[in-house]
């Protein structure tokens, strides 16, 4: 050992004297800065120990190899373990170099360890993320009879915070307060951190406010805690207080505040913070990454790329944020290009990056790219990660290939399947395969795999059958999962969805502590089935219960006022939000705009819209829709133009709204302008936008443009297929409509009620009576869809156009549901065409009984009677019409 020590020291050009001085300096430095040791003041070093320690710790000498050489030299000189200062210094060097095993061996050789040496071990374990070992050593320290000091408590509380061990944290925190160490800065910051991570932000905030001299680290810890607890208001308030006070924000502060702006998509305030960052010169990689994340989450990818390009050496987080931003913006090809550049840059890719690029490929038009990414994932070994496997399952599900999703799931081992079974159940749900979801859940139980509240909630979200829902309900009662708040909420949502509102309300009442999500879900359930009074009453019950409604609950109540237009109720809710001071949120603002638009109060809707803190496509869409419904097409287009001119990229929902407005206008040029904008931003391939384009051109009478719009859609969905069928039907092209319908079925799509309206309408317009009967029967027999009055209207129209009026009457009388006024009105119109007076009288009488305020039935009957010269009855009909207060709408011309 002596030879080894001499040789090594000579090669490093370190003399024994220098070694002793170095270790002594280390000891003095650590004692003065970290351990508050009384012995540190007694050291009489002939040189500046701070400068010497800093020089050596920043050099190549501060590593494991050097530390072992120094230990060998000190052993040769018999200085270990008898020299306490040198032993502690060497212990600290082992800790700093990351070799805690060697540090533990050295600690065991110390004849009389003290609190300082114990602190070195506890801090070392914590520093190298060996948090459980840090807690064990803290317990060992008490077992050895040493009394912990502020350094001990600060380190062990930080370890508890990282482990998220609430019980042990509680014990240590109580003991810290009892021993009177809570006022030390190192303990205060650790307490703030542990309370924040254990969802006790109020306690963390109290510790912070009680602090006599909070440093920047304490400020950053409380701001990060507020961010972690999604208390964004506290983040901004603390940041403002910090800026006007004596503490100067650093890069960590700016990163936290920018993250809060990104979460709320507060671009305007984020730009203010960015300006302050530039002014202070705090643009490091962490802050720039936070700025990139802000722009990406707000949909401003050009600005995000500009900031990203200025980062000298982007980290893996920086690359991943850019990739995720393009994915969120539906720009999959840019996301793949970023991923390609990232691989060439040499940055180490992590599982978050991989899941982001996989998510970008989750669309029917990117099957080839999805396969290539999957192959790379398999080759690189990332497929062993559960989160990556879950992303692959979701990707194939969204691409429309649920079989490949299932294959990925089956290729996993039991542990991985346990972790992501919820993802598979959700994928089955999105692919409308509830049977497979139920079988998978049953298999989990049979194989002994653990089921939790997430598995049950995923399954309940799939079900639309009350009997199966009751079976799952029974399982939750047996397993005790029914006590979980999310499971209880999912159960009563299922009952509500299946039309069993009474059972749903019973379950709702059985939940002891209802959160806002429960109240909002029950209110939405009442709203869905038209129970306006009950929904509003439930909101009043919530207030009486002492629960303060959040934005989601208030938005649900406003949706009730929108679905069943009730302007007075809506104004009352708006007044409540103003009094409560919660009227500034984007979600609530959008709900208010939608409510006022649906209730016809467009002036108030525009006032709320103009006061929104940020431009919002959802609110814009609601207002455009309101303008369109009330004939203010030009106002809708002006609003759309203002949004585009401001540089805001409209989403598919806003585009669909303006296309519906264009379809209601008489100017095809407006629709063409919108189409040009859609082509420019690349949304023509989106199914929802393509369907709206198709419908617009159909109303303009351009069937060729309808076909072009359909051909541009990447992976047309059922809505797009149905829109094309309806377009052909509207233009009397029955054969083409039926060909599209058959092609749709060949592609694997199952028709719904709306699809059959288009099919039956095509048959009626083409006079295809037998085909109408066939498809009406197919609805029930092949797809289990019960026909509604709108389907029967098409059937009566087909019979009426073919002159089979008595058969149409017999068909109406044998309907499984009560015919409405439109059914009888359709027969009446056919009687007018074929001059069938007596049957026309019967049809008119039925239609007037059902809709006495509809002028159409009176006018049609009057015209039939006039054509056969029965003027007395014409006069009687007109008197009846006048007596009921019905007036014919006057004609108008745009010429």
From Swiss-Prot:
The keyword Protease does not apply. One of its GO terms (cellular component) is chloroplast. Residues 1-71 form a transit peptide. PPR repeats lie at residues 83-113, 114-148, 149-183, 184-214, 215-249, 250-280, 284-314, 315-349, 350-384, 385-415, 417-451, 452-483, 484-514, 515-549, 550-584, 585-615, 616-650, 651-685, 686-716, 717-751, 752-787, 788-818. Keywords: Chloroplast, Plastid, Repeat, Transit peptide. GO terms for molecular function: RNA binding. Residues 824-895 are annotated as: Type E motif. GO terms for biological process: mitochondrial mRNA modification. It comes from the Eukaryota. InterPro entries: E_motif, Pentatricopeptide_rpt, PPR_At4g14850-like_plant, TPR-like_helical_dom_sf. It is found in: Plastid, Chloroplast. The keyword Chloroplast applies. Belongs to the PPR family. PCMP-E subfamily. NCBIfam families: PPR. This is Pentatricopeptide repeat-containing protein At1g74600, chloroplastic.
